[in-house]
Structure formats: structure tokens, C-alpha cells
Curated annotation (Swiss-Prot):
Residues that bear Phosphoserine: S389
Cellular localization per UniProt: Virion; Host cytoplasm
Post-translational modification: Phosphorylated by host CK2. Unphosphorylated protein N seems to have a better affinity for leader viral promoter encapsidation. Phosphorylation of protein N in ribonucleocapsid may stabilize the interaction with protein P, thereby playing an important role in viral transcription/replication.
Keywords, sorted A to Z: Capsid protein, Helical capsid protein, Host cytoplasm, Phosphoprotein, Ribonucleoprotein, RNA-binding, Superantigen, Viral nucleoprotein, Virion
Name of the protein this chain belongs to: Nucleoprotein
Family: Belongs to the lyssavirus nucleocapsid protein family.
Subunit structure: Homomultimerizes to form the nucleocapsid. Binds to viral genomic RNA. In nucleocapsid, binds protein P and thereby positions the polymerase on the template. Protein P acts as a chaperone on free protein N to prevent it from aggregation before encapsidating genomic RNA.
SUPFAM superfamilies to which the protein is assigned, alphabetical: Rhabdovirus nucleoprotein-like
An annotated GO cellular component: host cell cytoplasm
Gene: N
Any one GO MF annotation of this record: RNA binding
Any further remark recorded for this protein: Displays a superantigen activity in human and mouse, activating mostly V-beta-8 subtypes of T-cell receptor.
Length: 450
């Protein structure tokens, strides 16, 4: 008997077949650099910076920016942002800089140039006759890179969220050490005329390069990061959610994974912790792998690890976290089962803590406390034990263990308890649910059961 086949009759004829479904045909690409070469892009001929500044500023005032010219200018302007490397800087075996080296953003990457001239038109007229200052260059670079952040804000954000962000960014780039170079609302107007900057590979690459530089190098103009910070851990929402989750419940990654009682987690956990990646290395190329073009399909996105993502946010919903209630459910990754496990884990970690005295008036008090704790431990070890050791976790006061939670789930037949459902309904019904969000899912799924 073939376990994969089913047998049935069609017009009195016995049919035996193996049901096969569509599987994910896309290969996830890991970002590790194997050839020891820095990330690279190719741009047109390097411009005269004064001419380029006037052209790009003119285009911004007219809300008509040429993406190729913008990228060429941003790459050339990197020379204005020299800083000192605080420590030897290596990533994936590549030496980026030594401690004490003077570096600029283009020290992190390779930017090749062709002989193709840019347009450098004066779309918005010619207003500036003198050469721009470094502060003016810095302001223009900051405003241009902020188009990346604005284009990453999804349409789900209601009201004037994007306009308010744009206004705050403009205020930053008209305050010292920057200088005002555009009229109010110019940034938002420019964004509306071309809203897809985050999809332009070269622009995304330059935004990631600037962000990687300013995140490590102390600099007068570090506030430029306000527009590029969204390139850090881009398309890593699954991994970022897991990191936030373990901090929230105060466990190590290893301890947390022991609570993941579902076979569908196996492939996702293997994918998230693939050896050879620099997920835990500060200032690695890994942090900006998406913008630097090191991976076309991220293995760390919410879709790539959808069961993990769903579970984490169901636990977050149980704990009443707005971020989780607003997050989008990955519908193809067993949300009903994940909501059950999320209820039990939410109950396990919600409203409980592990506490102990850590600070004392003097050394004598510390020693007395440690001696008393040692005595308690000795007494516990000497207990003749009225409970079988296998059942210890479940029946003793120590319920915060994977074994105890798993036992509770099995004793309830893999179903949520009424108290779990009431909690889910309570947090989701008091929240204005966005379409396809966890709040909407919980409301629709459990409100009739409460």
C-alpha cells in the first residue's frame, strides 16, 4: 500500500492516484558573500558636483526628478561624509576598513562608472548662481534619501501619517547642521510625483550604503539616516519578529524554540538559522542585504517563515500588543492552529515573571542571601518526592516549561480553553481592525464562541 495514494471509483472503475499540489517554486537566496568582493553597482559618468546639485535641486522643486541623475549625484556626494572607522571592520571575510582609517560611504561598496553623461537639466529653473555649501549638499542628500522611506510606507496607514512623516523630515533638514533648501511640503509633492523610489535597484543600493555607513560612523550629518533607516533588516520581518518575541518573553532563542509544537516549524527554523550567515554580527552586510542586492528572495521575510510569524503575533495579540493586532496574517500558514498554540503560550508568559533579588545593601547581606538560597536548594533536592519525576513539571509550581505547556494542550485535545477565547475576543474587539490583520482574524474566528 502506497501511503501517498488515494483510491476511489469513477464510473465503476477503480482509480489510484497521488494528489499533488503546487509548491513554492521560488528559491530563497541566502545573502552570504562567497567571492570576497564588495557589493557593486554601475552608474553613469561621475558629474561635476556643483552642476549636479543645481540640476537635482531644480528637479525637486519642479517635482520632476531623473532617477539616473539622482543616483549619480548621491554616489558622487559620498565624498562629503568622511569619518573615522572606530574598529577594524570586516564582514563575510571582506576587510571594509581598519581602525582609524578615514572612510566615506563608498568605502563600503564598489561603484563602477561608465562614460555615459547624465541629463543634468534645470527643470525647475535656475535659482542658485553660487556654488552650494557642504551643508546644502548634505540637506539635498538627506531629502533625496527620504524619498526611500516615504515610498516604503504602505497604504494601510490611515489619515495623514505619511504627510506628517514628510513634514518632520523636512524640519530636520532645515535645522543646523543642515540648511533649508526647499519650501515646505516640497518633499511630499515630489514623492507623489514618483512614489516608487524603493523599487529602483540603484537608488535602493545607495540608500542601504548610506545607512550602513551612518549606523556605525559618528558624523555631523548622521541624521541623514532618518530617510534610510528602513533599509536595515529590510524583508526580514520574520527574523525581526522572532528576535522581538524572545526579548519580550525573556528567553534565549534555543529556549523559545522548544515551545514550537508543530511540524511546520521545522523547515522554517532551519531556514532562519542557516549556518554561514551573519545574522548576529553587528554592522555586517547582512543587515542591508536586500538593498545591497545580495538576495532577491529573502529567507527571513514573514512569508518565508509564515508559521513562526503567525505564532509570534498571536502571542502578541494575547498580550494586547497593538503591533501584533495590526500585523497582516499569513493566510497560507495554518493561522487557526497557530492561534491555538498562541493562546497557550500567551497564557504561559502573560502576567507572569521570574524574579529574584539582585541588589543588596552590602556584601554581608549578599552572602547571607546566597547562603539562604543554597539551603533552599539543598532542602528541595533532599525531598523524597511524592510525585513521579516525569510529572514534576506539570504538578509542581514550576509550570513555565515546554513539557508543562505541551501537556496542557494535549489534555485539552489541542483546543483553546474558554479563557483563551475570551482573552482573544477582548483584545481584538476593542481594536479598530485593519483588513487581513490578526485583530480581524481573531474577531471573525472567535467572537461567536465567547
Amino acid at each position: 500500500m502506497d501511503a501517498d495514494k488515494i483510491v476511489f471509483k469513477v464510473n465503476n472503475r477503480v482509480v489510484s492516484l497521488k494528489p499533488e499540489i503546487i509548491v513554492d517554486q521560488y528559491e530563497y537566496k541566502y545573502p552570504a558573500i562567497k567571492d570576497l568582493k564588495k557589493p557593486c553597482i554601475t552608474l553613469g559618468k561621475a558629474p561635476d558636483l556643483n552642476k549636479a546639485y543645481k540640476s537635482v535641486l531644480s528637479g525637486m522643486n519642479a517635482a520632476k526628478l531623473d532617477p539616473d541623475d539622482v543616483c549619480s549625484y548621491l554616489a558622487a556626494a559620498m565624498q562629503f561624509f568622511e569619518g573615522t572607522c572606530p574598529e577594524d571592520w570586516t564582514s563575510y571575510g571582506i576587510l571594509i576598513a581598519r581602525k582609524g582609517d578615514k572612510i566615506t560611504p563608498d568605502s563600503l561598496v564598489e561603484i563602477k562608472r561608465t562614460d555615459v553623461e547624465g541629463n543634468w537639466a534645470l527643470t525647475g529653473g535656475m535659482e542658485l548662481t553660487r556654488d552650494p555649501t557642504v551643508s546644502e549638499h548634505a540637506s539635498l542628500v538627506g531629502l533625496l534619501l527620504s524619498l526611500y522611506r516615504l515610498s516604503k510606507i504602505s497604504g494601510q496607514n490611515t489619515g495623514n501619517y505619511k504627510t506628517n512623516i514628510a513634514d518632520r523630515i523636512e524640519q530636520i533638514f532645515e535645522t543646523a547642521p543642515f540648511v533649508k533648501i526647499v519650501e515646505h511640503h516640497t518633499l511630499m509633492t515630489t514623492h507623489k510625483m514618483c512614489a516608487n523610489w524603493s523599487t529602483i535597484p540603484n537608488f535602493r543600493f545607495l540608500a542601504g550604503t548610506y545607512d550602513m555607513f551612518f549606523s556605525r560612523i559618528e558624523h555631523l550629518y548622521s541624521a541623514i539616516r532618518v530617510g534610510t533607516v528602513v533599509t536595515a533588516y529590510e524583508d526580514c520581518s520574520g527574523l525581526v519578529s522572532f528576535t522581538g518575541f524572545i526579548k519580550q518573553i525573556n528567553l534565549t532563542a534555543r529556549e523559545a524554540i522548544l515551545y514550537f509544537f508543530h511540524k511546520n516549524f521545522e523547515e522554517e527554523i532551519r531556514r532562519m538559522f542557516e549556518p554561514g550567515q551573519e545574522t548576529a554580527v553587528p554592522h555586517s552586510y547582512f543587515i542591508h542585504f536586500r538593498s545591497l542586492g545580495l538576495s532577491g528572495k529573502s529567507p527571513y521575510s514573514s512569508n518565508a517563515v509564515g508559521h513562526v510569524f503567525n505564532l509570534i503575533h498571536f502571542v502578541g495579540c494575547y498580550m494586547g500588543q497593538v503591533r501584533s493586532l495590526n500585523a497582516t496574517v499569513i493566510a497560507a500558514c495554518a493561522p487557526h492552529e497557530m492561534s491555538v498554540l498562541g493562546g497557550y503560550l500567551g497564557e504561559e508568559f502573560f502576567g507572569k515573571g521570574t524574579f529574584e533579588r539582585r541588589f543588596f545593601r552590602d556584601e554581608k547581606e549578599l552572602q547571607e542571601y546566597e547562603a539562604a538560597e543554597l539551603t533552599k536548594t539543598d532542602v528541595a533536592l533532599a525531598d523524597d518526592g511524592t510525585v513521579n519525576s516525569d510529572d514534576e513539571d506539570y504538578f509542581s509550581g514550576e509550570t513555565r516549561s515546554p513539557e508543562a505547556v505541551y501537556t496542557r494542550i494535549m489534555m485539552n485535545g489541542g483546543r483553546l480553553k474558554r479563557s483563551h477565547i475570551r482573552r482573544y475576543v477582548s483584545v481584538s474587539s476593542n481594536h479598530q481592525a485593519r483588513p487581513n490583520s490578526f485583530a480581524e482574524f481573531l474577531n471573525k474566528t472567535y467572537s461567536s464562541d465567547s
